[in-house]
Regions:
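Terminal, regulation- and interaction-focused segments at domain boundaries
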Residues: 1-15
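Short beta-edge strand/loop motif at the mouth of beta-sheet-based domains
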Residues: 6, 26-61, 151-153
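Hydrophobic/aromatic beta-strand elements that line small-molecule binding cavities or substrate pockets
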Residues: 7-9, 61-68, 93-101
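Amphipathic alpha-helical segments
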Residues: 12-31
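A short, structured loop/turn motif at beta-sheet edges
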Residues: 15-16, 39, 67-74, 98-108
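Hydrophobic pocket/interface hotspot
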Residues: 18-19, 28, 46-48, 66, ...
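Beta-strand/loop substructures that line and gate deep hydrophobic ligand-binding cavities in soluble
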Residues: 84-134, 152
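Short, highly charged C-terminal tails/helix-capping segments
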Residues: 142-153
Length: 153
């Protein structure tokens, strides 16, 4: 069995701008990840990485393949796998992110991550996932609405 994590946020930005924040490397590096590889097309890779030590020698990464890529409506990343610094892999999962204009200046961003395991190996990942997405979406809001990147970016 598996679980689904979902959250959403309305931001003052167009769907095009919000979509770009998730799919353009230079944007992702400002608010979400320490490293990114993004092939902007169906079948392209979507991969993000975060350092877990000050030297930047090890870390976490999440990698999958765009099963759908429909600017500015949304995208689906399939075969998503999370890897720890100890090389433990969790997956596969599916990540769906949608963008809907709710006014001329606002967009609803909906994040749905499916396939989150219930086995003990998933406990720490599952416990932090909803909180991590909520915090990341607030970081996205700060970037899109205020131009404020994460510290050190």
């Amino acid at each position: 069995m598996s679980q689904t994590i979902a959250c959403e946020l309305v931001v003052r930005a167009s769907p095009e701008r919000a979509f770009a924040a998730f799919t353009e490397v230079r944007e992702v590096l400002k608010w979400l990840a320490d490293g990114a590889v993004i092939g902007q097309r169906e079948g392209g890779r979507w991969g993000l990485g975060w350092y877990s030590d000050p030297e930047g020698t090890s870390g976490y990464n999440i990698v999958g393949v765009f099963g759908e890529f429909e600017p500015p409506l949304g995208f689906v990343v399939r075969d998503l796998t999370f890897t720890t610094p100890e090389d433990e892999e969790l997956g596969p999962m599916t990540l769906t992110i949608g963008f809907e204009a709710v006014s001329p200046e606002e967009t609803r961003i909906a994040v749905v991550q499916q396939g989150v395991g219930e086995e003990p190996a998933w406990d720490a990942y599952r416990a932090g996932l909803g909180i991590s997405w909520a915090r990341s979406l607030e970081d996205l809001r700060a970037w899109l609405e205020e131009g404020r990147p994460l510290p050190g970016r």
